[in-house]
Amino acid sequence: MSKNIYCVFLRKQAEGQDFQSYPGELGKHIFNNISKEAWAKWQQKQTMLINENKLNLISNTDRNFLEKEMIKFLFKS
């Protein structure tokens, strides 16, 4: 059973994620502050970015671009 958290993206209490979806300290921050609903919205946006920009996730440059976009989307919206 998931815990409720204050989601900084939705700006309200919401169901937290079941597990840490992203590695490292950033992943811990996302797990503690981003709800399941907000993470699902990011996954949709991420898919659009990958397709529209023809990103190659093997490329460090493309992965770094995607990570910056994720931070902007989740924490600066």
From Swiss-Prot:
Q: Which GO terms describe its molecular function?
A: iron ion binding
Instruction: Output one GO BP term.
Output: cellular response to oxidative stress
Q: Which keywords does UniProt give here?
A: Iron
| Gene3D superfamilies hit by this protein | Fe(II) trafficking protein YggX
Q: Which domain of life is it from?
A: Bacteria
On whether Iron is a keyword of this UniProt record, the answer is yes
Q: Where is the signal peptide?
A: none
**Record-linked InterPro entries:** Fe_traffick_prot_YggX, Fe_traffick_prot_YggX_sf
The question of whether Magnesium is a record keyword is answered with: no
Gene Ontology CC: one annotated term: cytosol
Task: Please explain the role this protein plays, according to its UniProt record.
Answer: Could be a mediator in iron transactions between iron acquisition and iron-requiring processes, such as synthesis and/or repair of Fe-S clusters in biosynthetic enzymes.
Q: Which family does it belong to?
A: Belongs to the Fe(2+)-trafficking protein family.
Q: What is this protein called?
A: Probable Fe(2+)-trafficking protein
Q: Which organism is it from?
A: Baumannia cicadellinicola subsp. Homalodisca coagulata
